[in-house]
């Protein structure tokens, strides 16, 4: 079965290199013995994930090892505030012994214009009802409600949009959103000597103690309600302090800014993020970010920025030994929807994030040793991360490079949750 690394190898080994320099396309022939007369050069322009223009550029017969430049066309579909991506493809002109005409041998994507992410500034325009007792806090508005337990762990216990509950609450998922610092070790994490996976287990990263440190709320001048919750994930010699600031608006929008602060003695950190457990009905996953295959900070060259869609079941990669998979980098927004295309939407605020949607918790994957025995649950585990550790190559080579590791400093995940109708 083809796994995401195959696409990465194909991309990195491509026989033609493409760059944009000074408004022109620079083409380098990486072949040793043939020129580029066997290929065509095609392009597509996508705006916010939708193809708007396409065309072909005449490709010079560039000799092996040489480079040349081509003028780019004038694009008509660039729109202010929109994300505009140009994809250039090199494809076979004619059938070959090993592939048909049109087979893509190389491609590159160029961002012509970055789209605006959600702004941090949002004004409330309606009334909210706040009901509180010793154990819980309930905030409601027109067509929605959100509730927290405030004494044990500060968990969100309910999120209802248009009369439908978004969250599920299996016994083995007691806190929502749960701070996720651990991942099911990959083959590379186990590596020569198993050092990363061993370190994580030695420090208790796989089974943290979660403490509620504080919980309080207040009203803003415009009527929006701010809920501040601080929790700690405690490990053998260190901890990660999570501070979550929810701002609830009358239309059901929930702005969530979460900071993660590692403290004390900790091993290499696998991730810093949160996870929700969603009801089984919301099993169609759509995202604008890198895809369609899973990708990580140091393995995303082959994953294009685009608008992708698939079932949640399709997101997990079935390696023989269960391990972390399904991550998507540079997510601008995502939705999880039911058969009526209704559900929940999450937007990045100011900075993109990493995300996955799976039918497995981290523990489901971690505690199983054979893929054939891994049983999907009905619920959807939506993970969103401020930082994700790279994969490295230490199953047979070096570990994660420093630039793809997670610095032990404060990291922030800022998202905006709303109803998808």
Predicted feature locations:
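Extended substrate-binding grooves/exosites of carbohydrate-active enzymes
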Residues: 1-22, 32-37, 42, 46-51
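Short edge beta-strand/loop segments characteristic of extracellular beta-sandwich folds
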Residues: 24-32, 259, 416
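Short, acidic/polar linear motifs in exposed loop/turn regions
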Residues: 31-35, 94, 264-265
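Short beta-strand and strand-turn-strand segments in soluble, beta-rich domains
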Residues: 38, 45-57, 103-104, 238-239, ...
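Short aromatic-acidic-glycine turn motif
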Residues: 44-56, 95-98, 279-288
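Intrinsically disordered, low-complexity Pro/Gly/Ser/Thr-rich segments with frequent PxxP/GP/PP motifs
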Residues: 49-84, 90, 98
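Beta-strand/loop-rich accessory regions of lumenal/periplasmic or secreted enzymes
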Residues: 75-82, 96, 110-421
């Amino acid at each position: 079965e083809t796994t995401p690394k195959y696409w990465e190898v194909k991309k990195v080994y491509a026989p033609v290199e493409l760059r944009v320099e000074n408004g022109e396309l620079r083409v380098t022939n990486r072949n040793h013995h043939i020129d580029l007369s066997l290929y065509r050069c095609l392009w597509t322009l996508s705006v916010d994930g939708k193809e708007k223009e396409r065309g072909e550029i005449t490709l010079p017969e560039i000799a092996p090892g040489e480079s040349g430049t081509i003028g780019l066309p004038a694009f008509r579909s660039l729109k202010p505030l929109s994300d505009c991506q140009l994809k250039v493809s090199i494809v076979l002109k004619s059938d070959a012994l090993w592939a048909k005409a049109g087979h893509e041998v190389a491609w590159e994507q160029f961002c012509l214009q970055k789209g605006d992410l959600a702004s941090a500034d949002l004004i409330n325009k309606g009334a909210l009802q706040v009901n509180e007792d010793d154990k819980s806090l309930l905030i409601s508005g027109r067509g929605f409600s959100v509730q927290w337990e405030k004494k044990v762990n500060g968990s969100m216990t309910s999120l209802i949009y248009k009369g439908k509950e978004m969250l599920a609450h299996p016994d083995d998922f007691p806190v929502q959103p749960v701070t996720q610092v651990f991942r099911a070790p990959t083959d590379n994490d186990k590596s020569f000597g198993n050092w990363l996976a061993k370190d994580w287990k030695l420090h208790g990263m796989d089974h943290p103690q979660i403490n509620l440190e504080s919980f309080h709320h207040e009203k803003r001048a415009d009527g929006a309600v701010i809920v501040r919750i601080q929790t700690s994930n405690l490990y053998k010699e260190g901890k990660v302090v999570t501070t979550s600031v929810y701002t609830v608006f009358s239309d059901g929008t929930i702005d969530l800014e979460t900071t993660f602060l590692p403290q004390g003695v900790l091993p290499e950190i696998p991730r810093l993020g949160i996870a929700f457990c969603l009801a089984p009905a919301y099993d169609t996953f759509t995202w604008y970010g890198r895809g369609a295959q899973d990708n990580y900070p140091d393995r995303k060259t082959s994953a294009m920025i685009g608008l992708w869609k698939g079932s949640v079941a399709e997101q997990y990669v079935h390696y023989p030994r269960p391990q972390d998979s399904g991550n998507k980098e540079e997510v601008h927004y995502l939705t999880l929807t039911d058969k009526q295309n209704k559900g929940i939407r999450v937007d990045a605020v100011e900075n993109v994030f990493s995300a996955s949607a799976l039918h497995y918790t981290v523990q489901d994957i971690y505690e199983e040793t054979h893929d054939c025995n891994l049983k999907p649950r009905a619920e959807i585990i939506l993970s969103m991360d401020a930082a994700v550790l790279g994969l490295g190559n230490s199953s047979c080579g070096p570990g994660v490079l420093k630039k793809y590791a997670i610095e032990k400093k404060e990291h922030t995940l800022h998202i905006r949750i709303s109803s998808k109708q």
